Design a protein with these regions (language model features):
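Non-catalytic helical/linker scaffolds that mediate oligomerization, partner binding
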Residues: 1-470
Length: 470
């Protein structure tokens, strides 16, 4: 059973029932909706389609709403676009002007107050780069250090800067409330720089009936990298959004930062998603490049919870083939990774009772050569903690809550299973043993390790470990 989960962005190439069904059967676990594009009406149709397909297939396909995030853009040019040469002087202004080869307006009205001489401004995903020379009233006077073409409404970024404007835009607030109304499972928060950004979204979710929606913080700038521990402490995990991250920090740093962030999330028991350009060539081609295969395999080898498809599944020619390729690469890499040796050689210091129980479950499962670890969980927390140890043993996550059933689809190594509510733990374990036997085709003599807690509807009360022989 594949342990690494697959997230697919839904767009024109995949927003029909036949293709989406094939993607789910090929291995898609989570459907991502990119709210940087499309209207609420368009996204409502996608959500309805995802729900229809997952119900038809009886699969726990989760829905992830990816916010637009704080948006900084240049405005328009009289000619639509201009060419800027390296060494040219160019002005960005918060005033309203008609753009030309020397000046353009920006949509962020605090820009002249946030920037200072020496700061870097990049436009169009780093394709054109400027260094601030002087702030003169409402104007930011710069020198072009990497020439190129500027065109209308291209995005801007400011490496190593945290802007002073509010984190949550009115558009993001509207999108998140829309997501709550339509039952999304995760919100991916773009350009998170600090724990306060996460807390702002948590407050909005809780105030509008979305307390059961989990936040994934997208790490896309230096501040996010530096503050990743406090960010993770306040959300369910992170997405390593390598596209914008490679603009905000030197691109040569991205691989080592990716490994560092993956390791931190694993140790903290948080989900980590590796994203952007993983199989980019499959937008046009039916097979991935060798470099792309290595990229996906290395992320899997490092222990990422999920790998993600963006344009490949949203707008590419081969959305189903992209999912199949991703799944094949992940499965092969997992089969050739010694998870047992990794677990046994990793030093462990328990943080609390639940963490110690989760570690003990993994250790016991290895000792008795168990075919599965079965976690009966109200909130899914115990299953996530067991998952963090990247055990070689299959993990079955049993829950009575459909929301948790879908949420576990983003947890490494966990196969989510829906169960009925049971009158006692003994009855629950009996059902869990029976269901696991069917799912994994267990044979007489096979061992499984079960863990759970008292049947009282509270999360975090896991206190029992049991070995069962089929």
């Amino acid at each position: 059973m594949r342990k690494t989960k697959i997230i697919c962005t839904i767009g024109p190439a995949s927003e029909n029932e036949e293709v989406l069904t094939q993607m789910c059967l090929a291995g898609m676990n989570v459907a991502r909706l990119n709210f940087s594009h499309g209207s609420h009406e368009e996204h409502e149709k996608k959500i309805a389609l995802i729900k229809k397909v997952r119900q038809k297939l009886n699969l726990p396909i989760a829905i992830l709403l990816d916010t637009k995030g704080p948006e900084y853009r240049i405005k328009t040019f009289a000619s639509g676009k201009v060419d800027i040469k390296t060494g040219d002087t160019f002005t960005f202004t918060v005033d309203e002007v008609e753009g030309d080869e020397t000046i353009v307006s920006v949509n962020y009205k605090q820009l002249n107050k946030d920037l200072k001489p020496g700061d870097t401004v990049t436009v169009n995903n780093g394709m054109v780069k400027f260094e601030v020379q002087e702030i003169s009233g409402s104007n930011i006077i710069t020198k072009c250090v990497l020439g190129g073409t500027l065109s209308n409404r291209k995005s801007m970024s400011f490496p190593n800067k945290v802007m002073s404007g509010p984190y949550l835009s009115e558009q993001d607030k509207s999108d998140i409330i829309f997501g709550i109304k339509h039952g999304v499972d995760f919100v991916a928060a773009s350009f998170v720089s600090s724990k306060q950004d996460v807390l702002d979204i948590r407050e909005l979710l809780d105030a509008n009936g979305g307390s059961d929606i989990e936040i994934v913080a997208k790490i896309e700038n230096r501040a996010g990298v530096d503050n990743v521990v406090e960010i993770c402490q306040n959300c369910g995990g992170i997405m390593i959004a390598r596209g914008d991250l490679g603009v905000e920090i030197p691109y040569v740093e991205v691989p080592s930062v990716q490994k560092k962030l993956t390791r931190i999330c694993r140790m903290m028991g948080k989900r980590v998603i590796t994203a952007t350009e993983m199989l980019e060539s499959m937008i046009q081609n039916p097979r991935p490049t060798r470099a792309e295969i290595s990229d996906v395999a290395n992320a899997v080898y490092d222990g990422t919870s999920c790998v993600m498809l963006s344009g490949e599944s949203a707008a590419g020619k081969y959305p189903v083939e992209s999912v199949k390729a991703m799944a094949e690469i992940a499965e092969y890499t997992e089969q050739h990774t010694d998870y047992k040796q990794r677990f046994l050689s990793t030093g462990y210091v328990g943080k609390d009772n639940l963490d110690c129980i989760s570690h003990a479950v993994c250790s016991m499962a290895i000792d008795v050569n168990a075919k599965a670890i079965v976690v009966c969980s109200v909130s899914g927390k115990t299953a996530m903690l067991v998952s963090r140890f990247r055990t070689p043993v299959n993990i079955i996550g049993m829950t009575t809550d459909p929301k948790i059933w879908r949420r576990l689809s983003m947890s490494w190594g966990v196969t989510p299973v829906m169960a009925e509510k049971f009158p006692s733990m003994d009855v629950m374990f009996y059902y869990a043993k029976k269901a696991t036997t069917e799912i994994l085709d267990l044979q007489p003599g096979d061992n499984i390790v079960l863990t759970g807690g008292a049947i009282n509807g509270r999360s975090g009360n896991t206190d029992t470990i049991k070995i069962e022989t089929i």
